[in-house]
Amino acid sequence: MSIAIKRAYEEPSDDDGYRVLVERLWPRGLKKEAVPLDQWAKELAPTTELRKWFGHDPALWDGFRHRYASELDGLAEYWQPLAERSVRHKVTLIYGAHDEEHNGALVLRDYLQHWLRTHGPA
């Protein structure tokens, strides 16, 4: 299983595999043609309400992780195909946040990896 995360502002690499933007909003200051993607999975991003509540405040990180995981619980139709793809092919979750330690892509990656370890692909 191979699920990586990468900032949208980083150079794409041949090693990225299947590139999926996991943000509801396009990353600021980037032209769409500058960010090669295989998929833009807006549905997998935290809700606007949760994103605004979190505001990238590290003090709210634990609460954000739990709330976002709860949102993901109801979105299997969107994340399960990515998890299953990652069993055979590398998937890179692309995110726009500047904070590399507190962002939704980290939570999503951990969520997918946990699901694969405990349930396995369908």
Question: What are the language-model segments listed below?
Answer:
Residues 1-122:
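Residues lining hydrophobic/aromatic ligand-binding pockets adjacent to catalytic sites
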